[in-house]
Each structure stands twice: as structure tokens, then as C-alpha cells.
């Protein structure tokens, strides 16, 4: 079984505006991902999503295809797709990190490290910065989770 990590970004369509809607979607996604043995993190900054998915290559590709076709996403952009031996989000069925709702200290740390506009952290364009943001979000937002 080939394992992979896929990272993409997108912009929320107008259909997803409330945090309650997003949280319900993440809950359903976590259940589906558990079934499909996919793990990952969904980062939200304003109307922008950054998501990492890890798991079986076929399952991850199938899920990305659904996301790409989902009208709740606009401008879906594949950032990285790679085979992996090491999983960084192996215990996370799917977690939502809303950067706007972070406590002051973690939010300030991220705003000092990454570009931001109108209080929203910008999704980086360089792969190493994208991965750094995902790992920072994982560590700062859920430090007790490996």
C-alpha cells in the first residue's frame, strides 16, 4: 500500500460562512476519514483553507477529487503530493484550526512569523513555509497531541 501526503489550498465559496457549518463539515469529514484511514489538518484563515491529507494514495486522491469538485471550494490549488514514510498527522482523523479564533499568544506568534492582511494570516506560497505553518498550527493549537 502506497502512502502519501497531499497539501492543497482553496477559497471558501459563499455557501460556507459560519463556523458552525464548518465545524459540522469537519466532524463528518473526520468520521469519513477514520473509515478511509486518512488523517490530516484543515487550517482556516479568513476565507482561505489550507489542508494536509495523509493516507493511502488511492483514498487520498479520491478524497481530493471530491474536494476539487465541491462547489463550497473555489480556486483549489494542489501545493504538494508526495510519497511518505513518516506521518506527521497520524493521530488526527481531521482537525480544524481556525487561525482567527486562536488565543492571543499563539495567534501573535503566527502573525509575527507569517504575512498577514486585515488580521488574516496569508497562506504562504513556498512549500517549506506551507509545511512550517501546518506544523506550527498543529503544535500551537493542540500541543498535547503528537
Predicted regions and their residues:
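Charge-rich, low-complexity N-terminal segments
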Residues: 1-146
Amino acid at each position: 500500500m502506497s502512502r502519501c501526503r497531499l497539501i492543497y489550498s482553496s477559497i471558501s465559496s459563499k455557501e460556507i460562512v459560519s463556523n458552525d457549518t464548518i465545524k459540522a463539515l469537519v466532524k463528518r469529514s473526520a468520521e469519513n476519514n477514520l473509515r478511509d484511514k486518512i488523517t490530516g489538518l484543515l487550517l482556516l484563515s479568513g476565507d482561505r483553507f489550507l489542508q494536509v491529507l495523509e493516507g493511502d494514495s488511492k483514498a487520498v486522491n479520491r478524497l481530493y477529487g471530491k474536494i476539487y469538485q465541491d462547489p463550497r471550494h473555489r480556486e483549489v490549488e494542489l501545493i504538494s503530493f508526495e510519497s511518505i514514510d513518516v506521518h506527521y498527522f497520524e493521530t488526527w482523523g481531521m482537525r480544524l484550526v481556525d487561525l482567527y479564533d486562536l488565543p492571543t499568544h499563539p495567534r501573535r506568534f503566527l502573525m509575527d512569523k507569517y504575512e498577514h492582511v486585515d488580521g488574516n494570516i496569508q497562506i504562504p506560497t513556498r512549500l517549506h513555509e506551507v509545511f512550517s505553518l501546518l506544523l506550527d498550527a498543529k503544535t500551537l493549537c493542540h500541543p498535547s497531541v503528537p
